[in-house]
């Protein structure tokens, strides 16, 4: 009987493991007081469904909101923590800072908030809506979902000057490492999270310096010659700097690992991306993430949970905004 019972327990464990593997990535939240999986289970049980439906509707109208919301969450967390301060509008707020001027998807977050206030007034924070929406955009672009710890409250301060430390398109690996490390993220988190560039675009004005004038040369020598000619056609030297180019050439709207493969071929659009391949500190990680049995999806989920717990406001601090674009 003991043997039979042990076998039954083993089978039960394996069944649970299979469900976990084929469902969503099992990323667990870090030790942050106040955030947990299912925070709104009793106070607003349909919270995640309402957010998901709002994101689905926004994506159906304009698929560009997927990389926009993902980037918005990243920028929110990197400036005084994941407190929804990126969502506040007005003069000299984070939204007006240079790196944030082209962010898309604010209307999706506002729509979700309106519906949540109707269903559960004063319960769900804008910071949590943004964290949940970022996860949902990955799913919509054929990525793998994960469990998002919730329970954040909203910050009351949003200053454009605080956005100066956001990672930039010309940053070296060393500079990127410094910026990530300052927030408790390591080099692997850096390479994994930047893999979010598998969806989205960049304006020609952001990287055109690589195409025509880099350190006295005609172009950045790390760019594949064929790709260089392609980029120069898309982004002429005196052309419109607002023209958008896929960050993951050939697969710019699908969540996959081709972004890393492009780096290995000298086809990274941003300088800060391409150096992940040329720098020996990060190249081995890129090689692992582009491998046939890549763990990118699982690792991205884990790093997103780590990032989403940066500097969160919980407990009696902060507030639950009535509208995401303004403090109460």
Curated annotation (Swiss-Prot):
Record text on cofactor binding: Binds 1 heme b (iron(II)-protoporphyrin IX) group per subunit. Binds 2 calcium ions per subunit.
InterPro entries, A to Z: Haem_peroxidase, Haem_peroxidase_sf, Peroxidase_pln, Peroxidases_AS, Peroxidases_heam-ligand_BS, Secretory_peroxidase
Annotated residues for binding of Ca(2+) 2: 198, 248, 251, 256
Gene Ontology annotations for the cellular component aspect, listed alphabetically: apoplast; plant-type cell wall; secretory vesicle
Binding site for heme b: 197
Subcellular location, record wording: Secreted
Sites marked Transition state stabilizer: 71
Catalytic reaction equation(s): 2 a phenolic donor + H2O2 = 2 a phenolic radical donor + 2 H2O
Glycan-modified residues: 213, 262
GO terms for biological process, alphabetical: defense response to fungus; hydrogen peroxide catabolic process; lignin metabolic process; respiratory burst; response to oxidative stress; rhythmic process
Induction summary: Induced in response of mechanical wounding. Induced by methyl jasmonate, a plant defense-related signaling molecule. Expressed under a diurnal rhythm (circadian clock control).
Alphabetically ordered keywords of this record: Biological rhythms, Calcium, Disulfide bond, Glycoprotein, Heme, Hydrogen peroxide, Iron, Metal-binding, Oxidoreductase, Peroxidase, Secreted, Signal
Cofactor(s) of this protein: heme b; Ca(2+)
GO molecular function, one term: lactoperoxidase activity
Binding residue positions for substrate: 167
Keyword Methyltransferase: no
Family of this protein: Belongs to the peroxidase family. Classical plant (class III) peroxidase subfamily.
Function: Removal of H(2)O(2), oxidation of toxic reductants, biosynthesis and degradation of lignin, suberization, auxin catabolism, response to environmental stresses such as wounding, pathogen attack and oxidative stress. These functions might be dependent on each isozyme/isoform in each plant tissue.
Protein name: Peroxidase 71
Organism of origin: Arabidopsis thaliana
Lineage, highest ranks first: Eukaryota, Viridiplantae, Streptophyta, Embryophyta, Tracheophyta
């Amino acid at each position: 009987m003991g043997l039979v019972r042990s076998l039954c327990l083993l089978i039960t464990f394996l069944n649970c493991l299979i469900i976990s593997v084929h469902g969503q990535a099992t990323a667990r939240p870090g030790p942050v007081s106040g955030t947990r999986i299912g925070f709104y289970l009793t106070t607003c049980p349909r919270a995640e469904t309402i957010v998901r439906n709002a994101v689905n509707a926004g994506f159906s109208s304009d698929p560009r909101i997927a990389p926009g919301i993902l980037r918005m969450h990243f920028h929110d967390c990197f400036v005084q923590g994941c407190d929804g301060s990126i969502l506040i509008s007005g003069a000299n707020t984070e939204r007006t800072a240079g790196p944030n001027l082209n962010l898309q998807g604010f209307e999706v977050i506002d729509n979700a908030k309106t519906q949540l206030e109707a269903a559960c007034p004063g319960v769900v924070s804008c910071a949590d809506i943004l964290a949940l929406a970022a996860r949902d955009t990955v799913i919509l672009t054929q990525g793998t979902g994960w469990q998002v710890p919730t329970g954040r409250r909203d910050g009351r301060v949003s200053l454009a000057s605080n956005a100066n430390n956001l990672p930039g398109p010309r940053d070296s690996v060393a500079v990127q490492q410094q910026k990530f490390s300052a927030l408790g993220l390591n080099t692997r988190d850096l390479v994994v999270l930047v893999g979010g560039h598998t969806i989205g675009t960049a304006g020609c004005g952001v990287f055109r310096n690589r195409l025509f004038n880099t350190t006295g040369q005609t172009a950045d020598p790390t760019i594949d010659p064929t790709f260089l000619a392609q980029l120069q056609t898309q982004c002429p030297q005196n052309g419109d700097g607002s023209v958008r180019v896929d960050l993951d050439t050939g697969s710019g709207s699908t969540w996959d690992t081709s972004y890393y493969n492009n780096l290995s071929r000298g086809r990274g659009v941003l300088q800060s991306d391409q150096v992940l391949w040329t720098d020996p500190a990060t190249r081995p990680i890129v090689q692992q993430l582009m491998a046939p049995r890549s763990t990118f999806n699982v690792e991205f989920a884990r790093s997103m949970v780590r990032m989403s717990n940066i500097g969160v406001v919980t407990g009696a601090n902060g507030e639950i905004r009535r509208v995401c674009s303004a403090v109460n």
